[in-house]
């Protein structure tokens, strides 16, 4: 392999050879751009946009556009792009990853592709890892774009929807990866088009791309909330269910009954179909529910929750049996596996049935935190038409970038050669000895005024070393807080003569450590790592803090045989060898076997973590395909499309499904079970029951379907005429569809999550869990679509004109799964506090505790 590389060069070297002529072309415009006035330079933006409209491509414009940005940066910030930065800009425009060492000016590089791609007018997102960097870069680099006539926006955690919308509508938007992902999910939960904040996902430039697409890719983005306003509804429905009378099972409705004109009478408040595990309310039952909850029409869209919960309570009492389907143990309802008879702890029935059983058994009804929306970073960033990234360390993960994101990594040479000395790892027997050696090393460097940066993995270790340095009387700064503004200042000062800084490994990324002259004289920044990280890439990031732009510096890692890395992944035999050798205390161990053992352990961990991320992506891909379908359907509704044809298709599909469920095509007419068909169909579509005359008028079940479809469509058209304005009914269709889709999709996310957690057991049965998950997920998605159709059709047939037609969110967002503490400040009360005995602010004249305070 090395002979091949010597002969043909690395992948990066071969690619760079193709790019050099383009860089020369950019440089050739230098004098021409320098001769333009500010006004003429600004007008170039307009000229490029016009040329794009006339058919030129971005690649055609690249040399001139990059030269324009270069000149603008020189005039506005006094910074001119080096050749290597122009190379980086070209690679980013091509949708690749540029690996540029720390201090090579990645922030300035991003201005080139951002400007060029913003000319299309579709928006460019520059993605950073925290709010501080997004704000800093938008204010700093944004000056270049604004000078050239482009609008620059920034999205911060504290912003309102209106501010976010404005920022996303700018030509270039600076935003963190979390905000970008959560805004995408929130946009797919809105109920009016005007509430959307993002526009299309066109082009993303990801700063610290390895951190965003690899380190954070193991945790999906999750927006959670509580569906169902309160658990009290389950308890109320349980009380009602106990008061309702079960109707007698209706005997099969034969053809002879129909000929004799015998009408079937419904008895009781509800009927139970044990065969299909279905409970349906009779007319009497509907009246009882309406009286109990003091509502006018149970079928109205806003009463969907009540209707759903009443049916659940009836199912809990009539179809779910204690010690058969479930057991109650330690004040908890536990499901019994119907095939094995084993208790399944941790599993819960979905769609609220578990809560209904809890209410029935008088145990604490658990208020479920529901996942309202979720997506992984892998699938989210793959939605962009084009994406690129830059980082100081990506080559070690090149395979992952290529396999999962379709992006290759190009290593860009440094502007000046790196002269940092990377020493071999210093290995000690115990952690105590290692920390002692670190402190001695810091003391020696500090004595000659050399700045030192000590990188730790955990806050505990940074505090241990800090305490040891205090005892030695060495002044130092500890950086492990979450406040990014403070972090940048501390990191920037770490290059001063005699400075000692202790930082957790990831801290201070994005900020340069600049050396003063005395520090350079003393040997430059000395970087000490107190432990190897799980990924060589993060070790390299720490090393990369030193030796920027040709500065002197050195780096070394201190390791002990007690470190997690060596304990968990190092070979036990090796550890035994060193233990039996009896190494004297505080003495460094040096051995070739040890160095290779460390490298092998790191490779093992990296492979392990890559496997976890790949596995997560494969499972999420199943959800992703389903998510695309649901979100596309929602977007159609939001865009105000006429959904009439969609509803008609739902109606005909439901008729087909009901007929096929009850009457197979091979069955002779004499054996058709009209009773079951009527019960199933009229619960959804309030048609006149099918009778003997109808059966006589058709030859087979195909003709019966046709007859029932015609009747259902006519009935729907009659419902439309009840509304004075056709558009009023069209909006009602959209309201109902949104409400039902959202509710069912949220339940489906939960169900898929439960399936995902239990699917691993399939491996014991010699089955591939992923294949089983795909098949089961597909079936569940089909069921969800059928349920959406059924609920939508039922609601639209039963809706009454007097109700208000308003969209409302199905569930209230209560939080996300990412840390926002760094940006959230305590909220201050704006209104005066009202005490229980104060007069009520509503003006009733009563005390607050006897009036509005009761509800609070």
Indicate where each model-derived feature is located.
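Extended, charged helical/alpha-beta scaffold domains that provide interaction surfaces
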Residues: 326-334, 340-348, 549-550, 557, ...
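Short, Lys/Glu-rich amphipathic helical modules
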Residues: 448-462, 639-641, 693-699, 841
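Short Cys/His-rich zinc-binding micro-motifs
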Residues: 830-849, 853
């Amino acid at each position: 392999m090395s002979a091949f590389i010597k002969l043909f060069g690395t992948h990066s070297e071969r690619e760079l050879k193709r790019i050099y002529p383009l860089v020369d072309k950019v440089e050739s415009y230098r004098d021409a751009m320098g001769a333009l006035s500010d006004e003429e330079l600004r007008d170039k933006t307009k000229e490029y946009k016009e040329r794009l409209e006339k058919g030129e491509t971005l690649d055609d414009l690249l040399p001139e556009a990059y030269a324009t940005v270069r000149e603008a940066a020189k005039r506005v910030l006094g910074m001119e792009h080096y050749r290597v930065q122009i190379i980086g800009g070209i690679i980013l425009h091509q949708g690749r990853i540029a690996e540029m060492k720390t201090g090579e000016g990645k922030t300035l590089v991003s201005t080139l592709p951002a400007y060029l791609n913003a000319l299309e007018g579709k928006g460019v997102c520059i993605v950073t890892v925290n709010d501080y960097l997004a704000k800093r870069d938008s204010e700093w680099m944004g000056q270049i774009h604004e000078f050239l006539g482009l609008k620059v926006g920034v999205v911060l955690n504290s912003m309102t929807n209106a501010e976010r919308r404005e920022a996303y509508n700018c030509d270039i938007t600076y935003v963190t990866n979390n905000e970008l992902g959560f805004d995408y999910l929130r946009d797919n939960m809105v109920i009016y088009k005007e509430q959307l904040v993002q526009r299309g996902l066109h082009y993303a430039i990801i700063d610290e791309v390895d951190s965003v697409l690899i380190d954070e890719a193991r945790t999906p983005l999750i927006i959670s909330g509580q569906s169902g306003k309160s658990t009290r509804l389950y308890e109320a429905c349980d009380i009602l269910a106990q008061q309702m009378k079960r109707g007698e099972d209706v005997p099969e409705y034969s053809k002879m009954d129909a000929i004799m004109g015998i009408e079937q009478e419904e008895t009781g408040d509800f009927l139970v179909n044990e065969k299909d595990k279905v409970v349906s309310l009779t007319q009497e039952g509907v009246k009882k529910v309406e009286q109990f909850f003091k509502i006018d029409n149970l079928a109205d869209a806003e009463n969907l929750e009540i209707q759903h919960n009443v049916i659940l309570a009836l199912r809990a009492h009539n179809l779910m049996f204690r010690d058969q389907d479930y057991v109650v143990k330690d004040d908890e309802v536990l499901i019994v596996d119907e095939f094995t008879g084993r208790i399944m702890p941790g599993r819960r029935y979905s769609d609220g049935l578990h809560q209904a059983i809890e209410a029935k058994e008088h145990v604490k009804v658990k208020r479920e935190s529901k996942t309202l929306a979720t997506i992984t970073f892998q699938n989210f960033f793959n939605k962009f038409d084009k994406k690129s990234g830059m980082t100081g360390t990506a080559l070690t993960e090149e395979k992952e970038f290529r396999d999962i994101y379709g992006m290759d990594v190009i290593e860009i040479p440094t502007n000046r050669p790196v002269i940092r000395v990377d020493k071999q790892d210093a290995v000690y027997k115990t952690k105590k000895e290692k920390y002692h050696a670190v402190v001695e090393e810091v003391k020696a460097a500090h004595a000659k005024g050399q700045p030192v940066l000590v990188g730790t993995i955990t806050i505990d270790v940074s505090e241990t070393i800090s305490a040891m340095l205090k005892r030695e009387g060495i002044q130092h700064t500890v950086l492990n807080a979450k406040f990014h503004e403070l972090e940048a200042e501390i990191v920037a000062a770490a290059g001063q003569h005699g400075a000692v800084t202790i930082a957790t490994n990831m801290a201070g990324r994005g900020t340069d450590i600049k050396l003063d002259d005395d520090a350079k004289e003393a040997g430059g920044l000395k970087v000490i790592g107190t432990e190897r990280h799980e990924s060589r890439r993060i070790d390299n990031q720490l090393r990369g803090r030193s030796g920027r732009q040709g500065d002197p510096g050195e780096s070394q890692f201190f390791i002990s045989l007690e470190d997690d890395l060596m304990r968990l992944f190092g070979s036990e035999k090796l550890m035994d060898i060193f233990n039996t050798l009896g190494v004297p205390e505080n003495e460094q161990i040096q051995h070739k076997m040890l160095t290779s053992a460390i490298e092998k352990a790191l490779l093992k961990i990296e492979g392990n973590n890559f496997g976890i991320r790949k596995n997560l992506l494969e499972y999420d891909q199943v959800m992703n395909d389903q998510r695309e379908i649901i979100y596309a359907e929602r977007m159609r509704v939001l865009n105000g499309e006429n959904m009439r044809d969609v509803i008609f298709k739902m109606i005909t599909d439901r008729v087909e499904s009901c007929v096929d469920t009850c009457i197979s095509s091979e069955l002779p007419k004499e054996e058709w079970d009209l009773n079951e068909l009527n019960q199933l169909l009229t619960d959804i579509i309030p048609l006149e029951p099918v009778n003997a005359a109808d059966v006589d008028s058709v030859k087979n079940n195909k003709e019966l379907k046709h007859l029932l479809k015609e009747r259902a469509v006519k009935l729907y058209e009659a419902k439309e005429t009840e509304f004075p304005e056709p558009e009023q009914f069209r909006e009602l269709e959209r309201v109902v569809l949104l409400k039902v889709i959202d509710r069912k999709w949220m339940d489906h996310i939960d169900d898929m999550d439960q399936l995902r957690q239990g699917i691993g057991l399939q491996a014991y049965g010699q089955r591939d869990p992923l294949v089983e998950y795909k098949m089961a997920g597909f079936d569940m998605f089909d069921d969800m679509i059928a349920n959406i159709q059924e609920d939508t059709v039922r609601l639209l047939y039963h809706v009454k004109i007097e109700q208000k037609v308003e969209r409302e969110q199905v569930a209230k967002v209560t939080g996300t799964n990412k840390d926002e503490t760094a940006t959230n400040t305590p909220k201050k009360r704006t209104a005066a506090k009202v005490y229980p005995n104060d007069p009520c602010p509503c003006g009733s004249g009563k005390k607050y505790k006897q009036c509005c305070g009761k509800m609070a």
